[in-house]
């Protein structure tokens, strides 16, 4: 499975047409050989430098969810607070994602209580192993929360675990080709995308051709 992080309201500017452009552009390079899940970011209030990040509006998420269905794509999101977790749990989603933030890990039990799987990015091998043993519906991904991150740091931290699951913040597909992870996540952007989630570690449709 390939999870593409479409970002928050920052990347799409909460614009329905830009959301459609992002999804259309993915479909144009998708050969249909991989199980692709579109993942957004849902939160109410996250500070960023000297301002707050632009949250994805619920109506925009709904539009993205419905629009992606026309291509057969499943849509979900990372959640950063209880309110957005409850909001997302009302949708038919393949899983609910938690970022590599220790304060969010307790939500994995709440997610399980809603009947959904939890995919959780973790920053060390010990926690990866613990979550693997916790419950079959809690799925960890190896993650280095640097933007961009170095492949060396992933290898040093996770070595032989990356074939199970990888949230990739490097700038190329070296780790993907080397470890062939069962679940692979990376950020997604268009050539003209802006915002904190559209850095050099985010992949364009043209770049995704390498693995699709």
Model-derived regions: residue spans:
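Catalytic cores and adjacent flexible loops of soluble metabolic enzymes
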Residues: 1-212
């Amino acid at each position: 499975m390939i999870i593409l992080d479409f970002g928050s309201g920052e990347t799409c500017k909460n614009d329905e047409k830009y959301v459609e452009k992002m999804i259309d552009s993915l479909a144009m390079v998708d050969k249909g050989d991989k199980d692709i899940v579109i993942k957004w970011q849902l939160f109410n209030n996250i500070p960023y430098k000297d301002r707050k990040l632009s949250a994805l509006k619920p109506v925009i998420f709904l539009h993205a969810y419905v629009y992606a269905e026309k291509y057969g794509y499943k849509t979900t999101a990372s959640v950063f607070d209880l309110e957005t977790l409850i909001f997302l749990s009302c949708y038919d989603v393949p899983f609910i994602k938690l970022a590599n933030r220790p304060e969010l890990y307790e939500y994995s039990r709440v997610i399980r209580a809603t009947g959904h799987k939890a995919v959780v990015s973790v920053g060390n091998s010990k926690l990866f192993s613990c979550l693997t043993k916790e419950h079959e519906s809690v799925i960890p991904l190896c993650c280095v929360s640097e933007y961009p991150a170095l492949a060396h740091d992933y290898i040093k931290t996770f070595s032989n675990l990356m074939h199970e699951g990888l949230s990739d913040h490097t700038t190329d597909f070296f780790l993907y080709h080397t470890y062939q992870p069962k679940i692979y996540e990376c950020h997604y952007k268009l050539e003209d995308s802006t915002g904190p989630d559209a850095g050099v570690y985010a992949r364009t449709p043209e770049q995704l051709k390498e693995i699709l």
